[in-house]
Amino acid sequence: MKLVMVSGRSGSGKSVALRVLEDLGYYCVDNLPLPLMDSLLDQLKGSTELVAISVDVRNMPEQEKELEKQLSNLPADTELLSFFLNSSDEVLLKRYSETRRLHPLSRSKTSLKEAIEHERILLEPVSKLVDHYIDTSNLNIYDLSNQVREILLGTVDKELVINFESFGFKYGMPAEADFMFDVRFLPNPHWEPELRPMTGLDEPVQLFLSQQPMVNKFIWQIENLLETWLPHLERNNRSYLTIAIGCTGGQHRSVYVTDQLAKLFSNSKHMVKARHRELNNA
């Protein structure tokens, strides 16, 4: 089992790092008290090989040696990788002032500045025990995400999952769509009696639609649009992209266009999936 522990000062980006780990397939637990780590690993044994936890100052043992002892008692088959995220006092003060969130060590008589300084002192011993120390003072969330990903994978490239989904407008539009295209203006196989019982996955329907210049031009234009903007979407740290194609009933035109687009992009570096909502619900 591979265990990644993310610690660091509050406001330095632990939640961002944890989201990266979640996107990479890790089972993530936020703010786990360290005494519960053994119990968590026992429960997850056999069900997942990738586990990530984040711990903040409230869950850290006060003594450096106690932390070392807990980590050294991990099961022999556990591969531990640890991160410590830090930022300057000035940057943390600015971040908390902008978000108006409460610092974990803030009390009624403790100022934000005092809480930030106190946390730095408490966590200083921990910062010396980790494998990777990252100063996020001058990093935005995308820079931090890329840095964590590069440490874990050796590259900043991430696999974007592209979901092509066909649907019928008469049954409602999919709420999860990032891009939505209406193909109800295309020639409709429904009006061909021999094609009506079929779907866009059947060869006679595919042959009919492939012979329509409008259909081919529309598919080509969507392909060009996506190829143009996919690199920008990737740089924005997206993990999933859903392109929905809708016709009236979700049986012929949308199914065919979705199937063709999925085939066109299946040769790319991305993971491509095709789903036909109305066919699956039939």
From Swiss-Prot:
Superkingdom classification of source: Bacteria
One Pfam assignment: PapZ_C
Listed GO MF terms: ATP binding; GTP binding
Chain residues that bind GTP: 56-59
Signal peptide: none
Binding site for ATP: 8-15
Disulfide bonding pattern of the chain: none
Keywords per UniProt: ATP-binding, GTP-binding, Nucleotide-binding
Family: Belongs to the RapZ-like family.
Function: Displays ATPase and GTPase activities.
Protein name: Nucleotide-binding protein Ssed_0723
